[in-house]
């Protein structure tokens, strides 16, 4: 099993790098604004029809465009979800959502969180799934990538005032990147048996004579962008554990690759655009080392399982509870780490059924800001925030003004960096405390003790960091949780994006200075180690007390009792 686990990790990383490197080169061309003659007429037609000017924007114009675009998306999706009962493509005649669930879902999908307090096959019409959720899967992913584009340009340009055009970036990312790759992935999924139809649900009689309903729907098209855009919201309640959504080991492997594909490619693109590939490689090394260690720990924890099973006559202690036998423990563990390292949140097993240690690693990966490859766009700009913090700390140690890629990092930059890094931990800890201190919050906890605390902590960690996965033992479809988690998702998304664009606006105006004797090299092993240490230190200082009350306490209860 040990050899199989390392072989799985190695094969995954090799295929990921082989696919993401050429995509990184293509993304670099988009960032630098190189024209693509084949689609220039399509672009020109879009600008004429929409009346949008494609002139470059400064930082605040870019931020305003992104914010207004997403607020409009929330309103439109909210209305669609509320009125779906009166709209077509609803063969099961499902009614509209309650207002608080519709608001939660709209905010969730627009912010790329895809937190789901409902089961899709019992709640949403095909129109809501296609025109609502799938569309926002594309647009929310494009938003994250566009913000990353703006920040990369800020490092690459100097003595400038503009970061690009938000509308141009959103259109090009959607047309040139997301749609073509999603189409290829969708065809692969269909070949593996993922559903893609508009038929009504099938009502069948099993061999045992039991009546059963089989849900149908346009699953493959939504599934493709669900993983490619690190969205994570499943067509069905069981998400990628459902055989109609993720039927084979191959489809499972493709899903994991798709989740990391664009985040990894953006690192390659970053190095190419700033003119030093070592910078992108350093980020990839830091991310990969943390990722591999996390996967190994989860695999070990799930294989070790529960020591109390053997005395009861079980053949193995290994923890198969909540997992699909077609994937097994190793592939399930890898998927869990991939989906929480990225801001995806898709699951092929029930994370609530993981061991205490196995569940703590996905929880911790979210809490450090999902900077280990991370979401599309958000993973890169999240890690670059830690890069700025790292060079600041290094500058303090040697008594020099911090700089990165020839740009001086001043007081304003560090204030915005601190704000962006601290906003999500603040939301997580305050939200968890509020839920535990109120009767409405405690009413949703179905498991007592340390695990119940972990479920609440996981919910707010997932929402604030725009992941969307859950410890499903928490009952969250209530006005209290729907509204509080919606606020956490919105602030967690734009409370980071706005400071990032403020940093970009500051950096793009600065002159690039040549490296001196005292300049910290940021492309070598020393800096990679410092960066990893900074990520671990911030995560440890922020969340160790909370983790000690939840998964750590639960782990000790199991093993010390044994």
Swiss-Prot record:
Free-text function comment from the UniProt entry: Part of the high-affinity ATP-driven potassium transport (or Kdp) system, which catalyzes the hydrolysis of ATP coupled with the electrogenic transport of potassium into the cytoplasm. This subunit binds the periplasmic potassium ions and delivers the ions to the membrane domain of KdpB through an intramembrane tunnel.
Stored Pfam families: KdpA
Main location: membrane
Stated name of the protein: Potassium-transporting ATPase potassium-binding subunit
Transmembrane annotation, as ranges: 6-26, 62-82, 132-152, 175-195, 253-273, 283-303, 327-347, 356-376, 379-399, 416-436, 483-503, 526-546
NCBIfam families the record matches: kdpA
Keyword set, alphabetical order: Cell inner membrane, Cell membrane, Ion transport, Membrane, Potassium, Potassium transport, Transmembrane, Transmembrane helix, Transport
Membrane-related topology note: Multi-pass membrane protein
InterPro entries: KdpA
Location in or out of the cell: Cell inner membrane
Subunit structure, interactors included: The system is composed of three essential subunits: KdpA, KdpB and KdpC.
Family classification: Belongs to the KdpA family.
Family matches, as PANTHER family: POTASSIUM-TRANSPORTING ATPASE A CHAIN, POTASSIUM-TRANSPORTING ATPASE POTASSIUM-BINDING SUBUNIT
Molecular function, one GO term: P-type potassium transmembrane transporter activity
GO cellular component, as recorded: plasma membrane
